Amino acid sequence: VLTGEDKKHVQHIWGLLSGAEEDLGAEVLYRMFQSYPPTKTYFPHFDVTQGSEQIRGHGKKFMAALGNAVKNVDNLSQALSELSNLHAYNLRVDPVNFKFLSQCLQVALAARLGKEYSPEVHSAVDKFMAAVAAVLAEKYR
């Protein structure tokens, strides 16, 4: 459960990323494809090389969706409803992949933010991403 302090940490970190969302999103996706190669099966039409236009474009969408979740942290189910439907019913993404993406995001944040990504912030981001993953997986039940 996200506490008020957790929400502040997530919102603060998100503010630090302003302007770098596309680069970070591309880095996160590339990390996921490298660390968890089976995730590439959901993107058969993508050029999965580092910095490709497809990775950059989808990374930007990923970060925009997370930005929307950060803004609507108290109502994630409503904020992510369409995305949940898309991933569950149309794309049929295995929910375990949301955890993989979360791990890759956290590695990228730690590498990018250094000391700003304190243990408290890491914990808050982990809880936030777990909440996002849970909402995205709601439609699978």
Swiss-Prot record:
User: Which InterPro entries does this one have?
Assistant: Globin (IPR000971), Globin-like_sf (IPR009050), Globin/Proto (IPR012292), Hemoglobin_a-typ (IPR002338), Hemoglobin_oxygen_transport (IPR050056), Hemoglobin_pi (IPR002339)
Q: Which amino acids does the record list as binding heme b? A: 58, 87
Q: Which GO terms describe its cellular component?
A: blood microparticle; haptoglobin-hemoglobin complex; hemoglobin complex
| BP terms from Gene Ontology | hydrogen peroxide catabolic process
Q: What subunit structure does UniProt give? A: Heterotetramer of two alpha-D chains and two beta chains.
Give the protein's function. Involved in oxygen transport from the lung to the various peripheral tissues.
Per its record, how is this protein called by name?
Answer: Hemoglobin subunit alpha-D
Q: Which gene encodes it?
A: HBAD
